[in-house]
């Protein structure tokens, strides 16, 4: 089977310099959703017709299995499909999809393909409570499709028809080439409409079969930011419903956003206003507090992530405790039972089993052993303005508050570092490390007093 995806439109109503099909839905371009669905049908040829912003669109979705045809002039959907013909296998049927209709299920498309498997011309239709503005499916007394009539051309009787054309079709490719060549642009827009092909198919004696989706939102397209927002909510609610079916507890299904893939174990709980991006895995009994952002991360069994925590590119072991207001950046690896508390930032660092950095700390480019306590205000000084260096803290080290570790530096097992110490040399095992300081008290000091105005 050939699949052609039309993605050449300008999208004027989006009021954006970004091509319409590249506007994001759940963190991915609209067109990427359509391509992903198309791939599940295993087409022999997958062709995307580009036009407005062609180079930008091609760069965004380029892949070995995707070919591109260019519609240099926007002369209608029929003209767009015509540009793809040289790239198609004429011996295989062609399914036509739209780059701005992202939510059509693969199962819906398979039903349409199956309905037209005998070489018929197939149309995906949908029945709407309010079909205003759409082309109506006109049938004869026996129920066979005779034509598609646009709203402006419909008679009062035809306007009562609730079944409308979605634009998604499957057709024999050899005949499609002939029908496209016979299209005329005798309309107000001067365009060649793909919908006109159905009458040519009927005139040629082809059966026209139809199929419908399970839900009408599967056929909704995007022509404005309002419609994009509507589809985003539909998609996110579908994702939330699937999570609920899988046993995930959502404090409010309307207030969780998944912009990628979220895999959850048993008894996972997610509070409100959480965003998941990229590939995220939550193991059994994970609890996520409100207002967290988690991107490309794996979270171990029994972990608790408190409110306002940001996690990006991190790996968390079992029974870790993170936040609130913590930030784990790419390369952060936390072993089982590690704690990273409020206003702690970890980047490209390993924190060992049971180690804790509970508040106000920066840990970057570091290897921290097991059972280490990092006091408040500790900083690994890892950057000299040009190069990054690592800090190594071995097992059972106690780091006092307001400590600076100037990398590259190693702190041996069992060391105690006094509060307010700057470490710039390696420290041997088991010692107390401190900077000698003298505390002085002076009598007779008078504090300055502000003058009254």
From Swiss-Prot:
Residues annotated for UDP-N-acetyl-alpha-D-glucosamine binding in this entry: 6-9, 20, 71, 76-77, 98-100, 135, 150, 165, 223, 329, 347, 362, 373
User: What segment(s) does the record annotate as region Pyrophosphorylase?
Assistant: 1-225
Could you tell me one molecular function GO term of this UniProt entry?
UDP-N-acetylglucosamine diphosphorylase activity
Instruction: Give any Gene Ontology cellular component.
Output: cytoplasm
Q: What is its main location?
A: cytoplasm
Against Gene3D superfamilies, the record matches this protein to:
Hexapeptide repeat proteins (2.160.10.10), Spore Coat Polysaccharide Biosynthesis Protein SpsA, Chain A (3.90.550.10)
> Where is region (Linker) located?
226-246
Signal peptide range? none
Q: Which GO terms describe its biological process?
A: cell morphogenesis; cell wall organization; lipid A biosynthetic process; peptidoglycan biosynthetic process; regulation of cell shape; UDP-N-acetylglucosamine biosynthetic process
Q: Where in the cell is it found?
A: Cytoplasm
At the top level of its lineage, which domain of life is listed?
Bacteria
Which pathway, per its entry? Nucleotide-sugar biosynthesis; UDP-N-acetyl-alpha-D-glucosamine biosynthesis; N-acetyl-alpha-D-glucosamine 1-phosphate from alpha-D-glucosamine 6-phosphate (route II): step 2/2; Nucleotide-sugar biosynthesis; UDP-N-acetyl-alpha-D-glucosamine biosynthesis; UDP-N-acetyl-alpha-D-glucosamine from N-acetyl-alpha-D-glucosamine 1-phosphate: step 1/1; Bacterial outer membrane biogenesis; LPS lipid A biosynthesis
Q: What class of enzyme is it?
A: transferase
State the active site: 359
Q: Where does acetyl-CoA bind?
A: 376, 382-383, 401, 419
- Residues annotated as binding Mg(2+) are 100, 223
**What binding details are noted for the cofactor?**
Binds 1 Mg(2+) ion per subunit.
Q: Which UniProt keywords apply?
A: Acyltransferase, Cell shape, Cell wall biogenesis/degradation, Cytoplasm, Magnesium, Metal-binding, Multifunctional enzyme, Nucleotidyltransferase, Peptidoglycan synthesis, Repeat, Transferase
Name the cofactor(s).
Answer: Mg(2+)
Q: Which reaction does it catalyse?
A: alpha-D-glucosamine 1-phosphate + acetyl-CoA = N-acetyl-alpha-D-glucosamine 1-phosphate + CoA + H(+); N-acetyl-alpha-D-glucosamine 1-phosphate + UTP + H(+) = UDP-N-acetyl-alpha-D-glucosamine + diphosphate
Q: How does it assemble?
A: Homotrimer.
Q: What does this protein do?
A: Catalyzes the last two sequential reactions in the de novo biosynthetic pathway for UDP-N-acetylglucosamine (UDP-GlcNAc). The C-terminal domain catalyzes the transfer of acetyl group from acetyl coenzyme A to glucosamine-1-phosphate (GlcN-1-P) to produce N-acetylglucosamine-1-phosphate (GlcNAc-1-P), which is converted into UDP-GlcNAc by the transfer of uridine 5-monophosphate (from uridine 5-triphosphate), a reaction catalyzed by the N-terminal domain.
Q: Which family does it belong to?
A: In the N-terminal section; belongs to the N-acetylglucosamine-1-phosphate uridyltransferase family. In the C-terminal section; belongs to the transferase hexapeptide repeat family.
Q: Which PANTHER family match?
A: BIFUNCTIONAL PROTEIN GLMU (PTHR43584:SF3), NUCLEOTIDYL TRANSFERASE (PTHR43584)
User: What protein name does the entry list?
Assistant: Bifunctional protein GlmU
């Amino acid at each position: 089977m050939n699949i052609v995806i039309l993605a050449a439109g300008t999208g004027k109503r989006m009021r954006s310099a970004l091509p319409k099909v590249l506007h994001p839905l759940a963190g991915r371009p609209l067109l990427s959703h359509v391509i992903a669905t198309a791939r599940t049908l295993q087409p022999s040829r997958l062709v995307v017709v580009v036009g407005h912003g062609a180079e930008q669109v091609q760069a965004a979705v380029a892949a070995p299995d995707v070919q591109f045809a260019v519609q240099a002039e926007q002369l209608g959907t029929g003209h767009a499909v015509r540009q793809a013909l040289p790239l198609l296998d004429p011996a295989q049927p062609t399914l036509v999809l739209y780059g701005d209709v992202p939510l059509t299920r693969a199962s819906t498309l398979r039903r349409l393909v199956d309905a037209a498997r005998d070489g018929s011309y197939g149309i995906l239709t949908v029945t709407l409570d309010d079909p205003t503005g759409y082309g109506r499916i006109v049938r004869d007394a026996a129920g066979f499709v005779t034509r598609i009539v646009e709203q402006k051309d419909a008679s009062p009787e035809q306007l009562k028809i609730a079944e409308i054309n979605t634009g998604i079709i499957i057709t024999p490719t050899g005949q499609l080439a002939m029908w496209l060549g016979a299209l005329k642009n005798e309309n107000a827009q001067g365009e060649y409409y793909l919908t006109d092909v159905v009458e040519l198919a009927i005139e040629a004696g082809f059966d026209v079969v139809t199929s419908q989706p399970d839900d009408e939102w599967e056929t909704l397209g995007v022509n404005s930011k309002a419609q994009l927002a509507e589809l985003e909510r539909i998609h996110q609610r579908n994702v939330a419903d699937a999570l609920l079916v899988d046993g995930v507890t959502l404090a409010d299904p309307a207030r969780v956003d998944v912009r990628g893939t979220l895999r959850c174990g048993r008894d996972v709980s997610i509070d409100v206003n959480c965003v998941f991006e990229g590939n995220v895995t939550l193991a059994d009994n994970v609890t996520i507090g409100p207002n967290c952002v988690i991107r490309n991360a794996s979270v171990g069994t029994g972990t608790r992530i408190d409110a306002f925590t940001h996690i990006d590119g991190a790996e968390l072991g079992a029974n870790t405790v993170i936040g609130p207001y913590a930030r784990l950046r790419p390369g952060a690896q936390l072993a089982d039972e590690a704690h990273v508390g409020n206003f702690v930032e970890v980047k490209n660092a390993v924190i060992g089993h049971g180690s804790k950095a509970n508040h106000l700390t920066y840990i970057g480019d570091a290897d921290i052993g097991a059972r280490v306590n990092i006091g408040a205000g500790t900083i690994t000084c890892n950057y000299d303005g040009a190069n990054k260096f690592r800090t190594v803290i071995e097992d059972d080290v106690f780091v006092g508050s307001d400590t600076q570790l100037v990398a590259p530096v190693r702190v041996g097992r069992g060391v105690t570092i006094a509060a307010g110490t700057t470490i710039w040399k390696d420290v041997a095992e088991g010692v107390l490390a401190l900077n000698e300081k003298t505390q002085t008290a002076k009598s007779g000091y008078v504090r300055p007093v502000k003058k009254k105005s």
